[in-house]
Amino acid sequence: LADMNTWVSVHCAPSSGTATRPTLTIASIKAFFDSQETVPEKMESKDQMGVKKALHPQGFTIDETQTNLLYALLQMRRLETCMQGLRFMDIKRYGIAFTHLLDGENPIYFKTGDLRGALQLPGDVIEAGMEPNPREN
């Protein structure tokens, strides 16, 4: 929580109009994310976008408090690493399903455990006899 407040102090102005920079607490983070709708795993329109996506962590469990803190942390990482291609590792680690809405085309759905998310082994490793990671067609 201290690191998150440090991040806020570096990235947010002390005040803007009548708003002032918040000091994050577990209660304030919980209140904010409890008030947000969870984004459906299969979005149909941009109106359904939001900061709260269902988490399905692979290999570990998280309680409600940890989930709300992770929502906040993931949003901070999303802002911090925008356009750097680093969000995909968080998507895989926390099992976040998402939808790409494309103008004039059918949406692309990426679900938890989607085989398209497995990084393929290098060609020389496959040629040496190791079985490649499975793919969906």
Region locations from a protein language model:
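Acidic/polar-rich alpha-helix caps and helix-coil junctions
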Residues: 1-137
